[in-house]
Amino acid sequence: MRKRFGMPGTAALIVLAFALACTSISARPVYAADAPASSASPVLLLYDSLALSTPRAGNVETLERLFAAYGIEVAAMPVDRYAAGTLKSYKRVAVVRNAPDLSIAGSALASDLASYEGDYLQIGGQELPDRMRAKLGLKLAAAPLDSVRLDAGDYSQTLSAVEDLDYVAGASGDASRFGSLTFTSDGTRSPYALSADGYAYASYLAGGDLTELALAYAMKDWLHASGEFGTYMLIKEIYPFSDLELLKTLADRLYGAGVPFSVSVKPVFYNTDYPAMQRYLQALQYVQARNGSIVVDAPAVAATSTAGDGSLHGKMSGFVELLAANGIAPLGMGAGLFWTYDKVYASQGMSFFDSVFLEPNADGQHVQSTAASTAFVFSPFVMPFAQLQNFEQRGTALRTPLPLNLALSFDLFQDEAAMEDAIDTISRSWIPFADLKNGTHAVHTDRLTVQSSGGSLLIDGQPLDIGKHERAVDEDYAYTAAAKTSFAKLFGIQNQILMVIIGTSLAVFGLFLFIGYRRYKRKFLYPGGRHDSF
């Protein structure tokens, strides 16, 4: 047992047209990818441990999001809750071995796996079904505690001191190989993953490193997924009280750099007539006019119903319809993975969308948990752009096609300096970003349908003019309604009458003072008359 661890001028248009003509000859343009074509049968995902407080923590969730990126529903459970005969209900099974000291020998799972004839994927561990070992000709060995270099596609990364790593020491020549592991101490090199005849094995998976992408290459083959995949830019953490001027500047800079992008915006359910909300909508109109696509972010649990009273459906559809009424076409949703494992969130909050950007789970509260996830037609795997920066890129241009739809995410920047640094990094990355609008996406509410196809946006079948159409914001907006009054007109007339009476009385009183003063002077200051002549 091992120890555990602006509009261009005419000349500019001519130059641009010439450049585009040349580009069409020398390179294929980047289009938004359609949904991956793969069998939609669900996967049973079993794991022996969640590996909390270890480098492998989060790898089960990562695998769930990878399956979601291929439109596959997942039923996940720990190995110790497996019931005999469960495998018969699934054509695909994936097993994650995070704890080498937890053996499944003699268990109901081991017995069922011995006769299981469906597709099988295992990540880590040396306990394998005999069928898999024979099909792949697989020989495994325990790796020393050593740093290892992982190569996958156009990227590589050095993983430091990987504990409990089992590597492929030998395999059948018919098995497809994906990625490679090179041990620093002695230069030993082995495939990262293998796949053949419905069986696949990967040595290791950890959330937040290159193994996420490396495993996707093997999963694409194992799932028989086909189609073209794209890389998307996703800007997150956008609220009505974010720096909207910075958001507009970001849209201008990305538009000028020719980079299509999407923004994930927080929904607002109340006070949508406030000036702050009107500025929010204007900013989203501007972003859309600068070739940005709009995605509705999942609301915070506290902002929705946690009792399952059905209010979430009306709130989400109301926000979608508010956007559409203001000439904004939302094309999808962004949410944490746990939303797909909740009956209320999936049916009331996500059912409007066929495209969802699934992110790692953050703090959240379930309303009604489900054993299996809800899958979507288009669901890119979301990876922070900062994580990609940890990978070494071989060569300037990317040559190896991606194995899945990938969304590289940023939070809205704190200031313009951080934004400029990020845009400079994006420009130097040579990543061919795809435009979400070029794909086919649909959003349906009870009252309207929003669609995109081939770069066009449609609301109820009518093309949307995405040009700017800002409206003036009422700066004198009354945030509280005027109090209801009775007899206001009558009391208004009465006040006017009283003012006239008081004014007349003051005038008469002043006249009497003047007359009295004159009489006082004549009687007491000059008795007998004035004697001012000599």
Tell where the protein language model's regions lie, with residue ranges:
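Short, charged N-terminal beta->alpha structural module
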Residues: P42-E73
